[in-house]
A protein has these predicted regions:
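Bacterial N-terminal signal peptides
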Residues: 8-18
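Positively charged n-region of N-terminal signal peptides that target proteins for export
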Residues: 1-6
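Mitochondrial intermembrane space
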Residues: 20-106
């Protein structure tokens, strides 16, 4: 039987090297993440007067992405001023945003 003092030391050592992901983040961390996603998606949309529609949706870590719906006006000459809607996927690993038109979601 191991020494009673050895067990906590072994558990502590294993916990520091274990690849188990954190199960929760602080409220401040989630708020910062939402702000980062919003800024990246608004910028990537290319829409004039871009704004989020609803809230940022964070998928679990197995997906590694967050999503946002962005509305605004198209700047391109043929569609200038028309309302546009884009779906944005934010990759949490690369911290990059990709957008695709989502006008049919109206």
């Amino acid at each position: 039987m191991p020494s009673p003092r050895l067990v906590p030391a072994v558990i502590s050592a294993l916990a520091t090297i274990s690849p188990v992901p954190a199960l929760a983040s602080s409220a401040d961390a989630w708020a910062a993440h939402r702000q980062e996603v919003a800024a990246a998606c608004l910028r990537a949309s290319g829409l004039v007067d871009a704004r989020l529609v609803g809230s940022v949706i964070a998928f679990d870590d197995s997906v590694g992405s967050s999503a946002a719906l962005v509305a605004g006006r198209y700047p391109q000459a043929p569609m200038a001023g028309q309302e546009g809607l884009s779906l944005c996927l934010f990759d949490r690993r690369s911290r990059s945003a990709q957008v695709a038109p989502a006008d049919t979601w109206r």
